[in-house]
C-alpha cells in the first residue's frame, strides 16, 4: 500500500471513528479499495483546438470561480479497460468528422465482466450518416455506443451493460443502465454486498428494503430471507431491478414503485396505492424483522426514521457520514450499533461510504 493511499484512508478512519464515538460502536471494519483502476465509469469533456481534439476535465482555481482546462491522456483511477480504450477511441473519432463534429462529451461505462458502453454527446442533431459511422465504430472496437443530443438518443447495441459478481457461492448478474446510478467502484461494491449479507446472518422473518435502486443489495440479501419487499421510486431502476431478479432466477422478491415516505403511508394504512394492487403486492402479508436502507445523501426523513424504529434489525449503508450521524441520534434511542464499517468507495476524495447494523435494545 502506497503512503498516499494509506494517508487518505487513515484520515477517513480517524474522521469516522471520532465522529461516531458517542454511539459506542464496535471496532470499525475497514474495506480498502484498489489504489488504481477502481472506477468503472468515467466522464470527460472533449476539447477542440484548431489542430487537435482531446479528453479534458476542469480544475477550479482557489477562488472557485475560474476553471482551467486539464488535458487527460490517461486516467489511472478508471478501470484498465477504459484506459486501454481511451486512445483507440480518440484516434477513431479524430479520423472521422461525422463522429467528431461538435462532439463535446464522452462517457465510459465498463464492467468487470468485460462489457463497455460509450456515450457520445453532441451539440448538433445526429443523422443517419452519423448512425452508420457509429455502427461501424462499435463493431470495430467491440463496444456498445449511444449517441445523445438535445431531444435525441440513438442506441447502437444496448443502452446498458451487464455486470457479474461472484458472491455466496453463486454469480449475480446486474443490468446497469447508462443514465441510472450504479456503484462506481466494483471491487469495493462486492465487499459491501458481502458485509451486508454477513450483517443479515441469522435474521428471521422477512426483509424490507428501501431505496433499492437496480437491486444491487436486494439480490444477494434475498438468499438470507424467506421473503423480500424492495421499494424504489425511479421507474428505470425499478425496471432494471425486475430484469435482474428474473435473470438471476430469484423468486422471493417483490419490487414496489414507492418512495420511502409513500411506503410508510401504505404500511401504516394511511393511504392506498393502485401501484401496489397492480403489482399484486399485499404489504400486510409480510412479517418484517429486518430493514435495509441505502438512502441518498440527504439521509432519511423523520417519518421513515420512526418507521425504522419498529424493526428488530436495521442495516444502514450511508454515502454521507453527516446525515448518518444525525439519523443515528434518533435510531440509537431504540437500537444499539453492533456492526460498524467503512468502505473506501471513493479513494482520494473526501467522500466516505459507511455501514452500520443496529439491533433493538
UniProtKB/Swiss-Prot annotation:
GO MF entry, a single one: tRNA binding
One GO BP: tRNA methylation
UniProt binding sites for S-adenosyl-L-methionine: 183, 211, 216, 232, 294
One Pfam family recorded for the sequence: tRNA_U5-meth_tr
Reaction catalysis annotation: uridine(54) in tRNA + S-adenosyl-L-methionine = 5-methyluridine(54) in tRNA + S-adenosyl-L-homocysteine + H(+); uridine(341) in tmRNA + S-adenosyl-L-methionine = 5-methyluridine(341) in tmRNA + S-adenosyl-L-homocysteine + H(+)
Domain of life: Bacteria
Listed HAMAP family: RNA_methyltr_TrmA
Entry protein name: tRNA/tmRNA (uracil-C(5))-methyltransferase
Lineage of origin: Bacteria, Pseudomonadati, Pseudomonadota, Gammaproteobacteria, Moraxellales
